[in-house]
Amino acid sequence: MTTRKNTAKNLLLGYLKEQGITARNSKVGVNFEYDGWNFLLWHDAEEPKFFRLTLPGIFDVTDENYAQALMACNTLNWRYKVVKASLYEYEDEGKRRASVWVCFEQMLDDGIQRQEVVERAVNALVEAAEQFQNLLT
């Protein structure tokens, strides 16, 4: 049984509060900024113990750099076990756009320590985002 206390959202909010980091609720989850990076925890009411922390929009994809961005995503996905990179397509002001997102996913169990999972996720995402940028140079 999932209690309100042991959800991914509450785990993250508890950690951010302990660290003095301000969080903002959005339609899709919880946003926060850390060390110059903007993070988003997707909240899934169907799976409240599914921890999906993302770094959205780390790279804008265009027709000209699409193949290079896709190959860099594939390379990251082979190198990292829990962090995955993907091209995310969206509509902005009536125009179709795409960007690269990196995502850390983990199912939470009742014994998990919030500091451990959040710090591991944040560090892995930042490392992967920096590695992605290096692959493009």
Where do the model's predicted regions map?
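A conserved amphipathic terminal alpha-helix motif
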Residues: 118-137
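Charge-rich, low-complexity N-terminal segments
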Residues: 1-46, 82-88
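A short acidic/glycine-rich loop-to-helix N-cap element
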Residues: 108-121
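Long, continuous compositionally biased terminal/linker segments
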Residues: 36-67
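Generic alpha-helical secondary structure
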Residues: 5, 9, 66-69, 118
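Short, internal acidic amphipathic alpha-helical interface segments
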Residues: 55-103
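Generic recognition of long tandem-repeat/solenoid scaffolds
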Residues: 28-34, 53, 98-102
